Amino acid sequence: MITFDASKCVACNNCVRVCPSVEANTVEHDENGKTIFNINPDKCIRCGACVKVCSHQARSYDDDTERFWADLKKGVKIVGICAPAVKLSFDGCWRGVLEFIQKNGVEKIYDVSFGADICTWAHIRYLEKHPGEKLISQPCPAIVNYIRKFCQEALKHLSPVHSPMLCTAVYLKKYLGETAKIVAFSPCIAKRDEFIETGIIDYNVTFERLGELLKRNGVDFDKLMKTRSNFEFAGAGGQMGAVYPRPGGLKACLELENPHLNIITSEGTDSVYKNLSLYSKVAERDLPDVFDVLSCDKGCGSGPAIGKQMSIYRMSGIMNGIEKYNRTKRVKFDRKHRDKQFLQFDKVLKIEDFVRKYKPDDVTEIHVTDEQVEDMLTKMGKTTDTERNYNCHSCGFATCREMATAV
């Protein structure tokens, strides 16, 4: 799903520098002998970090936008689910965007914030039934891909609870009897892996490609910003699940229900994958109850397919407003101070409908010996300790030794 255009690659090393998977980038030479960095799809986790930093447009991605639009025009019955990050991607006109999609044939569009509320409820109930169990959050599919490929010893800790997207889709199918195909609108490239594997959602349409689609169909976003839209999500609206896109969103939701949980967060490719690699080396007693992790440094609002990147100040302002609004919606308890939304979930939902099992990916590991690394360093002209420890990062790797290992 991450695509590569060799004609545009200048081997600037930016993709290597940000990639959490050293083996996902392969050094090759084109027919003219020019060095290029291709992609090994078996080792790629689809985090999209390389897409965000490639200023030459050599890296891009595929989603399901064209297939979705073609099916819609053929009359295929489709309903939509939309990630709450839509308010960040289409700031000031998200209702108009979804109204356009609905007018063009999508019968209903549901709010994934509601699925995020189900996700929070399922985590709380799961932890109550499994006291002492340590969980790694899984709403981020790039994180799931990384654990399944490179941190398989941590797989037993990966939360069995479905992501908010899948919780929403399961609810539509099992509880509302929805039979139409489901399109998910998201800022995430890697969601496509999750959808293909589970078979619950039929199309991953990224916000970036959705915006391009609207422009091709004559939508003027400046005009859309000034036009009042009456669009409303179908079905039950979400509450605190609307804060999931921000870093620590799951943590905030879980702590509202159980403030005694030990939850720590990590996000961004610079740190989260290092922390995941350390996770299984830590004594069980030192692990948090929940490790809330996201691949993107500012959460889903900075996803690789969000479209135009928003300033951290504007993003924070929007998310704070969303949180304040939804906190006022949520403060509705019964006489025993129990959350009414969760009481309703307890009556209607079965937690087993919202869980999944994971299998490790069959990734062939390449074992490099110290002797091979030493030999490669010598071939690279690095014969002294000083030369072997320049570690200037210009090649994209953190150390000279890491580069020699990759080569």
PLM-predicted stretches and their roles:
Residues D62-V407:
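Iron-sulfur-associated redox domains of electron-transfer enzymes in respiratory
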Residues M1-I2, S7-A11, K43-C44, L287-D289, ...:
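Short, flexible, mixed-charge glycine/proline-rich loop motifs
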